[in-house]
Amino acid sequence: MCGILAVLGCVDNSQAKRSRIIELSRRLRHRGPDWSGLHCYEDCYLAHERLAIVDPTSGDQPLYNEDKTIAVTVNGEIYNHKALRENLKSHQFRTGSDCEVIAHLYEEHGEEFVDMLDGMFAFVLLDTRDKSFIAARDAIGITPLYIGWGLDGSVWFASEMKALSDDCEQFMCFPPGHIYSSKQGGLRRWYNPPWFSEVVPSTPYDPLVVRNTFEKAVIKRLMTDVPFGVLLSGGLDSSLVASVALRHLEKSEAACQWGSKLHTFCIGLKGSPDLKAGREVADYLGTRHHELHFTVQDGIDAIEEVIYHVETYDVTTIRASTPMFLMSRKIKSLGVKMVLSGEGSDEIFGGYLYFHKAPNKKEFHEETCRKIKALHQYDCLRANKSTSAWGVEARVPFLDKEFINVAMSIDPEWKMIRPDLGRIEKWVLRNAFDDEKNPYLPKHILYRQKEQFSDGVGYSWIDGLKDHANKHVSETMLMNASFVFPDNTPLTKEAYYYRTIFEKFFPKSAARATVPGGPSVACSTAKAVEWDAAWSQNLDPSGRAALGVHVSAYGEDKTEDSRPEKLQKLAEKTPAIV
């Protein structure tokens, strides 16, 4: 990941303005510590802080077309850049950067080229021939981008809010799958997949199509000129990413440079579920595994930094971002600059434990659509900013455009959790990789119950956060929360504590409006809380709030014969239909 900042039409091309742009861009340097670039044309500025992943020697930005009339600053990876270059043979490329194709595609197709890009990206392009500009963000919002407006009529774009929040009174998250055009005067959606309408699909489930499409998604993301690894918690999603990556690593260009030994990383409190499961999967796959330990106090000490970098006060995001933030620092110290991660699967397949209570396939499917549309405010935000805080790039194969289209076209009846048929959450994905002849994973890992990252690193992590917040937020403070924070009022002491820290860094009303709100249980949307009347009394984003579902649910007996464990064993015995 890199950091980008663009200021366009600011009616000021003075040296003081240039210095201010450099100062603001420096706030993003953690995202791209390898090099800095700045393009100035009259009163337009494109700044770039580079994390060199592809073509480290010559791919510095901003990037240009042949005569430099088109300049572009990009944060992202374009996985199909070689195929796109094949159709641009009349153009002269200056670098081997995957992002340079953007300038030349614009020359060929004007603004209608964004859908050709297969990757994660946020970019701003300036056409100096008529001083027009466009900005665009990838389909799901894997890559962060904000848009703001200066009092002088200027338009601002930045990878993180901290680069524009002081100079813009009005700003917001740039919506995923959209393009901003100065010629057309606003935003429009470029990404319009069939599932976006939330109409219930009817395509029969084909496990081999699911498997093959996911494998292609992982292979694409092995495009790198620097050392990389996989974040391996031992859960289904990260384990599948690691397993598939390992199978194809030997054939990749990355193996020629860095060897075919896959590095995997896991973090947790001492004795946590993730450490145990991650070690077991790493041993099974034969990876070079790195276990990182932290204490509750280590996490608490990092909370302020986490909120500053991740730019949110959402409880579940902060809980999960903190261990990921700590792990990323260690990963960077080992010389690794890119990691593969398992975000997105739970949204696509209904993997969160509250999906057990989905009343029918229509509501199940609509909830998965809502979850995917909101990913840029939650898991994408966490995965990107927690790692980018230390100059590490996270790639997410489950959020591949083609894979999402395949998975979201499946009749949701197949995704429904059916104890009577031995189908636990994400059975569609588990079954697709249940290969008896050439196993991807051990059965008990393939059918391990979902653990949210903030739970899996150790249950005492969340309990410790709550205890810490209770010491800093009194009952009186919480009772008066609606007066202190009338917008998106915190409902718990933990939420209040995070909000006070956030407001210290980002005091403007526009900043707090970038953070989502509303009731949630076990990471549900507000709409899904209606599925179980009991949930309204236990609004906690932890998976343990899914009473009657999680094997370690709050206030429930943790016995060996609990119903979810029985269901897991039944699922392991259910014959695969691959």
Swiss-Prot record:
UniProt-annotated binding residues for ATP: 231, 267, 341-342
GO molecular function, one term: ATP binding
Record's compositionally biased regions (Basic and acidic residues): 555-572
Site positions for Important for beta-aspartyl-AMP intermediate formation: 343
Keyword Ligase (UniProt): yes
Annotated keywords: Amino-acid biosynthesis, Asparagine biosynthesis, ATP-binding, Glutamine amidotransferase, Ligase, Nucleotide-binding
Single Gene Ontology BP annotation: L-asparagine biosynthetic process
Entry-linked InterPro entries: Asn_synth_AEB, Asn_synthase, Asn_Synthetase, AsnB_N, GATase_2_dom, Ntn_hydrolases_N, Rossmann-like_a/b/a_fold
PANTHER family: ASPARAGINE SYNTHETASE, ASPARAGINE SYNTHETASE [GLUTAMINE-HYDROLYZING] 3
Protein name: Asparagine synthetase [glutamine-hydrolyzing] 3
Naturally occurring in which organism (per UniProt): Arabidopsis thaliana (Mouse-ear cress)
